[in-house]
Each structure stands twice: as C-alpha cells, then as structure tokens.
Amino acid sequence: SRGLGDVYKRQFQEYEDIDFIRDQIKEDLVSGAEKNGVKVLTMVDVGWVYWFTTNTIHTPKDLKEQKIWTWAGDYKTAKLWDEAGFNPIPLAVPDVHSSLQTGLVNAMPFPPLYVAANQYFGITKNMLNMKWGILTAALVIDLKVWNRIKPKYQKVMMKVSEEIGLEYQLNNRKEEDEAVNVMKNYGLQVNNLSKEQINEWNVLVESMYPLIPVSYTHLTLPTTSSV
C-alpha cells in the first residue's frame, strides 16, 4: 500500500505523527482493501521516503527537469505528477536498476534501506535530505480464503501478524539512519536544504492537494505532537 505516502507527502515529519494518523484512517484503508477482495492482517510503515537522484537537486524546479520513476500500473500517481508539471516514467520495480543504468529514469522516491539493499546508490549518488513521505506496507490474504478459516484461527493469525509487523517496523526505524551512513561511506552525497528551499517543497505539496482524488488533509495532530 502506498496510501499514506500519497496522502501525506511532507505534511508530517515524525514517526509519532504517522502512528497517530494511521490509527485515524486505518479503518478506511482496511475496509477499502476488503472491497477489493483482500483482508489486511497488519499494516506498518517501511520507512521514510527520500529523493534519490543521479543529478543534484534542491528545489521542485530541479526535480521537474528529471525523469521520475513511478510504479507501473499506478496510473493515478503518474497522472498526478504529469498534471503538476513533472515527468513521470512508470516502470515495474524489477526494471528500476536497468532503467537507471540507461538513463530512462534518474530520480526516484524510496526509503534508504531499500536503496541500500538494491545498491541503487551506485547510480543515484544524491539523496535530498528531506522526508518526502512514508511508505506503508500491508500483509494481506485473499478475502475468500480468509472467510474459510475458522474464527479461532483467524484470531491467532491476526495476533501473530501484528506482532511480526511491529517487530519489522521497529527494526526498520532503527536501521534507517545506519543505511544512510553506509551509503555515504560509498560515495552517497546527502544534500541539505535551506529554509527557503524547504518552503518551496511545502508550497508544491499544497498545490497538489486538489489533484488528489481522496484526501485526509482535514485531519490534525494532537496538540502534544510536533510537526
């Protein structure tokens, strides 16, 4: 699932905020999945998404000059980028590495752990030091299969799935910074932004809200949280 990442680009910057918001919209996401024939056993974040690029970028204008990888089959996201003035290139994940090598794409939003594991950083040598969004994943099972499972076993499966998901999430959160440091040792350039440049990105995201078919931008964080 990429729902949280699509809805909340740049809006929240702490894991506590993401946990709060996910709790608020989880029921909608789960029911939406069931309408599409799948049962969600657990839902966790995979990590913060950053921009990894072949060329150095600092502003949305810089990104508009790049060729952005988007998920193959995710036509809504590709259309969103296109309408915002960017150059999306839909590709299947297995084609990302070869497409980076040939220059078909040269910009991609991914969590650092994923970039490190696939060694994309050998080509995309620049990371924009800005949390772009959160990548969310879910463990699912076909709803018809789920409905054939006895309730007592369903309960056990849900419990085990939640425990495994939480452990996976905690490990990812701990190892994220380590992945960036490892890539820096191999030549990754982490590019910081000025306040003015950060504001440009925030303005861009706000301008894209009307283009998003389903939005939860009315939700707010509790006053004790920091943004």
Residue spans of the language-model regions?
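N-terminal secretory/targeting leader peptides
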Residues: S1-E16, S31-L219
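A gly/proline- and charged-residue-enriched helix-loop-helix capping module
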Residues: E16-V30
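A generic signature of intrinsically disordered, low-complexity regions enriched in glycine/proline
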Residues: I21-D23, L100, P222
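A short, hydrophobic C-terminal helix/tail in secreted or cell-surface proteins
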Residues: T220-V227
